[in-house]
Swiss-Prot record:
Keyword Metal-binding: yes
ZnF (C3H1-type) intervals: 197-225
Name used for this protein in its record: Pre-mRNA-splicing factor CWC24
Keywords, ordered alphabetically: DNA-binding, Metal-binding, mRNA processing, mRNA splicing, Nucleus, Spliceosome, Zinc, Zinc-finger
Subcellular location: Nucleus
Pfam families: zf-C3HC4_3, zf-CCCH
Subunit composition and interactions: Associated with the spliceosome.
ZnF locations on chain (RING-type): 264-302
Domain of life where this protein originates: Eukaryota
Major localization listed first in the record, in broad terms: nucleus
CDD domains: RING-HC_RNF113A_B
Biased composition range(s): Polar residues: 25-42
Length: 355
């Protein structure tokens, strides 16, 4: 019976399970082989299985070894790279956009990068100073308070000014320049010129009526003279000395009788209510007013009239003389026509004169 059982066990087939899809890994196949060999009888099978497992372990150890060749680094400061920073970020597992773009000069170890970063930061500061608004210092102060840089979180007391404000005040200086605290920073792109003209502080009651209820205790000046501001003096036509002399002088003093025209230059007709400008040109009053409504310059020479048209005395005198001469000639002609002398009387008068 024992011999029959031994022969039956020796003739029993070995069952091996295989996957239908995919290739079986090396570890699985070696395990199945070890199971099959261990199921066989005899000490030779166990020793064979032990040797197979040792060889597979040595093969797996030799296959997992990775050799990395180190690249040679040159000490040239002109050669720059960001490989070390990228490798460090990849190992830490945080590859964000800000970390990829930021390159630390100390980590890279390049001398040229330090100088270029300093130059770029200075240029950026100049651009910010030129483009910032007038309340940039208040904005930075607000951000510092929000971030808690000036707070007493570390236990060190820094005074009442460093207290953290959790409520946003309306009068923070950023919303309106009229309510801002402290001086306003001047813009760098716009240049302004300010002209300040102070009021004379003259007592209005005393100037207009000559009486003030406050008497000597009035804080305003008691003077009835005319006080004008700077812009009012500039508007006046006689503000300059040259213009004042031109106004005080008579424009018709230097004119002779031959220089006086006999007709208006605008309407080309005889004068009707003639006027003269400061530049000694004669026009009709209606023509001069119509011309001034369209253009304030003189029609003859193009100088500024200033709206001053004086009565032309010499033209009026000349017109009166012409009228008197015409009237006298008309009178003489009329008298001569009314009292004609006969021809024989003229002849006898001539004969008597000859004798």
């Amino acid at each position: 019976m024992d011999g029959a059982t031994e022969s039956g066990a020796a003739s029993s087939p070995v069952v091996v399970f295989k996957r239908k899809r995919g290739r079986a890994s090396q570890g699985t196949s070696s395990t199945l082989t070890n199971v099959a060999t261990s199921s066989q009888a005899g000490p030779s099978g166990a020793s064979r299985a032990h040797s197979d497992s040792g060889s597979s372990r040595s093969d797996s150890e030799s296959g997992s070894t990775v050799v990395i060749k180190k690249k040679r680094r040159s000490a040239n400061p002109l050669v720059q790279s960001t490989g070390r920073v990228y490798r460090k970020l990849k190992l830490s597992g945080s590859l964000d956009g800000e970390k990829e773009n930021s390159v630390d000069a100390d980590e890279s170890g390049d001398a040229g990068l330090t100088s270029s970063s300093i130059a770029s930061s200075s240029l950026q500061k100049m651009r910010e100073d030129a483009t910032r608004n007038s309340d940039w210092d208040l904005d930075t102060a607000g951000t510092l308070k929000e971030t808690g840089v000036t707070s007493n979180s570390d236990g060190l007391y820094r005074g009442a000014k460093s207290y953290a404000s959790f409520t946003r005040t309306r009068d923070d200086g950023c919303s309106s320049k009229m309510r801002s605290r402290g001086p306003i920073r001047q813009t760098t792109t716009v240049r302004t010129t300010s002209l300040i003209d102070y009021q004379p502080d003259v007592c209005k009651d005393y100037k207009e009526t000559g009486y003030c209820g406050f008497g000597d205790t009035c804080k305003f000046l008691h003077d009835r003279s005319d006080y004008l501001a700077g812009w009012q003096l500039d508007v006046l036509p006689n503000s300059s000395s040259r213009t004042r002399e031109n106004m005080l002088s008579d424009p018709e003093d230097s004119d002779t009788e031959d220089d006086i025209p006999f007709a208006c230059l605008i309407c080309r007709k005889a004068f009707t209510d003639p006027v003269v400008t400061r530049c000694a040109h004669y026009f009709c009053s209606s023509c001069a007013i119509k011309r001034f409504a369209k253009n304030s310059k003189c029609f003859a020479c193009g100088q500024q009239t200033g709206g001053l048209f004086n009565s032309a005395k010499k033209v009026l005198e000349r017109m009166d003389k012409l009228k008197q001469q015409k009237a006298q000639l008309r009178r003489e002609k009329h008298e001569w026509l009314q009292d004609p002398q006969p021809t024989h009387q003229l002849a006898t008068a001539g004969d008597s004169d000859v004798d």
